[in-house]
Structures are given as C-alpha cells and as structure tokens.
C-alpha cells in the first residue's frame, strides 16, 4: 500500500485524476442511449409466402414444408415454427442469441432460393423475409382517419407514402398496415347473365387480362427526330373496364358491364380497422432487432410534421400508441431513487462521523464513482435502462463502503491524537488490504454471471458490469482521493462541540456496549450459535423450494394487447360486429385511454386490439387488475373471446399467441394431435392456476367439400383444372390483372357478385363451358356437403404442432402454473406419440430454474477462491462466507412478506447479498488476524476486540447499503414492479444478516481456530509418544 501514499503527498495530481474520471463520466452520460432494458433481442426472421385461394392444408404441405426443410438446415436455429392459413404461410425462425442477424438473413435468403423449385408454380411472388419478430408489440401505432376519403384510399396513402418513409428511418424493422387493403378494380360477375350468354368465367378473366397489357412498343425515328410509340393499352379505372367487350353473341357485343358490376374498391373487401370506434387505418411500427426504442420513436415523432404534410388536408394522422412515455417515466423514477439513495447514504455518514468535513469526503467519493461509471458504460455499448440505473442505485451503498472504512479508520487515529497526515498514511496502510478484499470479493460474485450464456446472462450483463465498474472506481477513489482529503480536511473535534449528534452517539454507544455484553454470552455458548447457523442453512433450502417463482416480474407498461378468437365458422360481417362490441366494452373501463383494433385478412375468425392505459398517476389499478375486471364483462359476449395481456419488454419466442405463456403439443400424427388437443385444453381450462386458456388449433372451420364425378366429367368433356378454375374465379377474389401507377401497383380482382356468395345454393348457378362450348352446370358433375376443416395448420420443427396459450390469474405465480400443467399431463395418460413442452417465456423459465442454484453456487465458489488467494488460507474464507445463510433467509422471508415471487431480479439480489454481507465478516476477521498474529491477544480476545472496534464501520456500511436499496422498496411509480424485488431482497437480507452475522462470524472464527489448534497439537502428541 506504499504506492497509494504518493496520492496523499501529491494532492494536485490526485484531484486532477478525480476530475478526469468525472469529466469522462459526464461525457459518457450525454452519449448513452436510453432504453427500458438491456438489448436482449433474440435474432428473429419472419419468412412469408402467399398463394391466393389455397387452403390452409395446401399451404402447409405445398409451401410451408418445402420452406421448412430448407430453412431447418441453417446453423444456429433454436426454434422454427410455421402457421399456414387461407392463402398465406408464415415461417418464424428464432436464432441463438450469439447468432448475427445479418449473417442469418443471408442464410435465410439462400435457403429460400434453394427451395424455390419445390414451391407451387402458381405463386404470384417469391417468398420474402423480414428481420423482425411478428409477435413483438409495436413500438408505435399511427392511425389515419378521414370523413371524405374511403378506407381503401387511406390504406393507399399509408402504403404508398407513409410506410415507405417510415421504413427508411433508423431503428424501424417493420411497418404493417391494417384495416383495409390497397385500392383495386373489382369485377363482380353475375353467373346467371353469364349462363344466358354462354360465357364462362375464365373467358371473362382472359378478356380482362388481354385488355390491360403493358409491354415495350419501340420507337420511330428519322434523321432529325425520334418518337416513342405509346398506346392506350392500359386500363386504370372501373369506368374504363366497364365497357370492355368480352364476347360476341350472335354478332352482338357483350360488354363487361352487361354481365358484371365494375367498381373502384379494394383488393380484399374483408378487412376492417377502427380507432376508438371510428373507421381507421392502423400503421403498426415495430423496431428492428437491437434497435433502441427511444431513438426509433423519437425519429418517427420528429418526422411527423413531414408525414402530415405529405397527406391531403382531409386526412388526419394521429399517434394512437407510443411505447416511450412509460419508459421515460420509469427511468425518471429510477433516477429519482438514485438521488434519494445518495442523499440517504450521505446522511448516514454524517450521523456516524458527526462532522461536515468528514461527511464531505465520502459525499465527494460517491458521485465521482457513479459518474465515472457512465464512461465505462458508453465504452461497453450499454444504455441507460432500468437495470443499469438500478445497479447504480444499489452501488450507492457499496461505493461509499470503501470510503467509510478508510475514513473511519483515519478518523479513529486522529481522535486518538495523531496528526491528520500521519493518520492518513497509517490508516490507509492498515485497511488497504481490507478494502481491496471487500471490493474484489464483491466483484467476484458477478464473474459467473458474466460468463453465463443465454437470456439471463445477456440480460444482467449490463447490471453486473455497471456495478463492478462502480465498485472498482470506488476502490481507486477510496485509496487515493479519500486519504488525501482526510489529510487536509479532518481535524480533531471535541465531542462537546457536536450537540446535534450527541443523542445519536449515545444511542450508538449504548448499542455497542450492549453488543459487547451479548457477544460475551454468545462466545461462551458457541454450540447453540453453531446449531442456529445449521438451522439457518436448512431454512434456506426449505424457503427456496417453497417460495413462489416466476421468470421476470410482470411489467405494467401502460399498454395491453388483445386477441379476439371467434367461432371458427363466423363470417367477416359478424366478426366486425364482435370487434366493435369488444372495443366498446374495453373503452368503457375508466383506466383505458384509447383502443384500436382490426380484423380480416387471411384469418377470418380473429382480430387484434391495441389498448393504451392512462398514466399510473391517473389510475389506481395495475394493468393486470384492469384485465381481471374486464375479463368478467368480456365473458358475456357470445360466440367470441377476447384475450388480454400486458405488453412486456421481454417476449421470448416467435410464435404469435393469444396469451402470455404457451405449452406446445407436437406429434408426427396430425389426427392423433387433433384428438388429444381438445382433451388437454379442456383439462387445462379447469385448473385454477390458469386463465384465458386457448389454442391455435382450429380444425372446426366450416368447409364445403365438393366431390367430382370423374366419369361424368369425362363424358361431358370437362377437365378438373377447368372445374377448379371456375371455383377460383367465382369465389377466390382472384387477382387477374395489374394496374401500374407511378407510385404503386394495383390489382383487378374478379369474383361473383356478393349476392351469390352468401349461400351454398349459389353453387347451383355455377357452370363450366365444356369442350363443345356448351355451359354445363356444376351440379351435373359434382356434389357437395358441409364438413369441418382447419382454418390454420401449425408446425414446429417439422412436426405438426398445437400451442395452448394461457395467462396467469392475478396473484398466481408461474411456478405454480407450470407444476399444475405437468401434473395434469401426467394424470391424463397422453400417449408417447403426442409430446408436450413449454414454449416461449414458460420454457425460458423452466430452463432458468435449473441454472439458478448452479449460478449461486458458482458465485459462492468464486468468492471463496478469491478470498482464499487474498488470505492464503482455506479456512478464513469459510468464516467469511458463514454470513450468507442468514442473508438468504432474510431475503426469502422478505419476498414472502411482500408477496413477491422469486424472479431473475430477486436472484440478482441474492447474488448481491453474497457480496454485501461478507463485508462485515471481512472487517472482523481482518482485524482479528492482525491482532492475533501480533502475539498479543488470544483468538477469542482478538475476535472480540475486532467486533467492538469494527462495530461502528459495520453499522455504517450496512446502513449505507440498506438505505441505498430502500428507495427501490418504497418506489411506486412506473417500473416499480422491476425495482421492488431487488430492493426487497437486499433490505431483507441485510436486516437479517446484520443481526446474526455480528454473532455467528466470531463463533465460526473461534470454531475453525480450535480445529486448527487441534490439528497442530495432534502431530506434536504423536512426536512425544514416539
């Protein structure tokens, strides 16, 4: 420690070094980005493919399976799921956390290219991919409304102008639009008129397609000029298509308007969107993987004036939902907790040291240590988020510890009559090793966490590094700035001149004297204390096993997502009514600010809702409580269910689900899976530990199954392809031509008039032109009957899959829910051909359970190794670590008392306690060893004196750590659900360990000393006998 004497003798250099650390920290703070949590996004790529009119089973077998076989060969894929519905397939690839998203995207594109030859030839476009997780909630939702423009026109503005501009902004990963579709010319055919004219639907299709052609025509030129040839070969509006001649009957022209209604409409008329019960187009913006939410949102908000200016004045563009306000509010709450923690810690120091001069020294060390940490955070690529700021808040009680130990020891020498300079040199020499041991052993706690892979390791890496850097800067400050300031600021102050702290000092002295008397009794009854310590260890095990557990505290982000699941045979019109009814019910809740939703597209019986809650200051209930009371009202809506869940910043997995947790059933036998899934779902629905139980298996959709009489078809001269083309032309909203415009491309859509799609009897009016050009009714060669058929087909890996989703009732923990599910699966006797496994967050929870104890054990072993190296002893580290059981009991009991489940945040609190509570033992053992090795005191006298001498700094450091964590316990604003488990764990552990450690540590110290003495005497006895 002679090196640090240089800093005492060179105050200018020391102050400039401190200033440099602080300035670097200020610069780093200004450059740090802001986010709710560390970036822990799994690389996710979504592959989409479409085949108009294809059934879900066709999409699964002809499109999804070839894609899955090719994509499944990519390295680093942790999960591959697919969903095939009417005309569309989506394959979601979730990669390992260490997989580079850009490299994965290149592999995905190569796999799509390899599978291209295996895909159906009728696909209008190649499969595409996006580097975005479709199950993530949007970071921002914009709405377009107008009293003059139609939904299709609004959708066109959103797609053509807004989507393109927003997609180019930094941080934006995907822009999806809901509520309608692009404008189109729709041709609604009258099959009766066509039959009377002897015109087939395919003839109409060909006539329209041939009338709208775009191709190069060439040019004409002479020696002087050049002319580009241009024709009117393109038709762009319904008015242009209506007079089109499609057939001649007995020499008379039959125009399109004679057999159809032609109008300017939209590509898919079965779409609806609403914002607060008003028709609207929703623009849903999702961030790119690893993009910063605040930066992304700020970029969009900054562009809003430009976006509004690009739209007609009659169109209103509003921000319906924004993730950033609650993030900013949460971070402001943490920053406030940090300031309160610093103030409380400085107050503790003043009460103990009774001098503003002495208090100013740690009061300077604390902000320098914390501010300097920002520089390291910036260099490491971290952000200002809830966890990193929580680390700094907790660090407030740690960074002052080193300064307190040095300051208190120097103050003790000055009070004994030593000059300040000499006291500083002597004091830092005496406790330098103690401070080093305390800091290094605390940092050692986080080494296993830094080496841990997976989500927990990535999630808490910033927390561990931030806290470790703050502690190391604190160590440097305590050995340089603190003794230098002590040498120049501290003076021996008569106790009589401190009237304001005399009362506190008398209390502290009485406590110290009482502690001394009780310690003597404890040392004389050491056996009972050792039994108490063993009982504490056993109690730890029992509490850990019995305490409710969850993966990550459920956040109240002020946003909720809703998923509507209606009867599988519901029509689009009825589904739109359900959406309106549900939005009305949700909007009526006093805690709800606004509601937006849409339905339609490829999933006819489902819809999505996005709900914004009022700020926490304006509502007296949590998001989960809002869901609980809405659940009762929503259950009264017949024929449909609305499942609500709070939006979370951490969502694991890529499967889109109607609830927060999933259990997936897999089988290679689709029929057996469809047999067992309803039984398992029904059993899950009866469990009180689960709520909102639902499944993505939808195999009861209404389907009209046509059976061709092939003999009759051959006799009538009709091919299967001609019959299929009839059905596709009539009912498939078939896109038969393309309209090219400067900013976008639009379609011509053909189907029979809506009047002929409302009832099955319309099939009687359908006909095919045979090889003899005669109209043959469909009923001549086909029969039909209604059956059940799947609305979607799901795969996971290459197996058929059904995912049962569920939420947790208020007050239920995830460990109870998973245990109940496992018991139910065992009791049902599910065959081995049907496999069940947790997915998404529930799967991550189960995986974390198996690693938590290993992580705690690794932290303890790491601390033991570091202490063993520092003390050159196998025994003294055990004495120091004997403080841990009491801290564990206190932490777990505190969680039980507050009704908080044991989560990853609480686990970090336990690991922090491993580093905190051993500080007290280090201070005792260090002084006892010095006294004992000097030969002046016995082991019992040495540890007794050490306990009394270090009583004041032990109380100071413990209270500092306790008050540093106390604001996290008492917080109640945005993000409190994240901060409270950490504060509860630390405060509970500190309170319990403070009471017990003061007695168990000296007893364990003497126990090991006696063992060592016995071992030494045994060889001497053997030598005397020989």
UniProtKB/Swiss-Prot annotation:
Keywords linked to the UniProt accession: Cell inner membrane, Cell membrane, Membrane, Transmembrane, Transmembrane helix, Transport
Any one cellular-component term (Gene Ontology): plasma membrane
Localization, UniProt: Cell inner membrane
InterPro entries in UniProt: AcrB_DN_DC_subdom, Acrflvin-R, Multidrug-R_MdtC
Parts of the chain that traverse the membrane: 12-34, 336-353, 360-382, 431-450, 463-485, 525-547, 853-875, 895-917, 948-970, 985-1007
SUPFAM superfamilies to which the protein is assigned, alphabetical: Multidrug efflux transporter AcrB pore domain, PN1, PN2, PC1 and PC2 subdomains (SSF82693), Multidrug efflux transporter AcrB TolC docking domain, DN and DC subdomains (SSF82714), Multidrug efflux transporter AcrB transmembrane domain (SSF82866)
Principal localisation: membrane
Membrane-protein topology: Multi-pass membrane protein
Gene3D superfamilies, alphabetized: Multidrug efflux transporter AcrB pore domain, Multidrug efflux transporter AcrB pore domain like, Multidrug efflux transporter AcrB TolC docking domain, DN and DC subdomains, Multidrug efflux transporter AcrB transmembrane domain
Coiled-coil region list: none
GO molecular function ontology, one term from the record: xenobiotic transmembrane transporter activity
HAMAP family xref list: MdtC
Family affiliation: Belongs to the resistance-nodulation-cell division (RND) (TC 2.A.6) family. MdtC subfamily.
Subunit structure: Part of a tripartite efflux system composed of MdtA, MdtB and MdtC. MdtC forms a heteromultimer with MdtB.
Name this protein carries in UniProt: Multidrug resistance protein MdtC
Organism, scientific name: Pectobacterium atrosepticum (strain SCRI 1043 / ATCC BAA-672)
Classification lineage: Bacteria, Pseudomonadati, Pseudomonadota, Gammaproteobacteria, Enterobacterales
